[in-house]
């Protein structure tokens, strides 16, 4: 049986790393399944509604990136990066203070 044509403009690489979605009033663990330069596919523990804009933390890399939710299907979501990744190590700008605190609570450094 033929596989459906992949219409992505960029190739995705497998990641399988722990992530954390942070929005005002929400910290949601997730798995970063795969990623490209412009987007990330996430797997969530629960089927919760997400706001359009999120802050996605890569726990292993201790980085955060602003993103927009592009699609949702069950417990998976695709997000489009809307900014560059910022380090959460050391001093961080005030806009990332909540993300740094969430990273520490999740066991990141």
Named regions from a protein language model:
Residues 1-109:
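Structured alpha-helical
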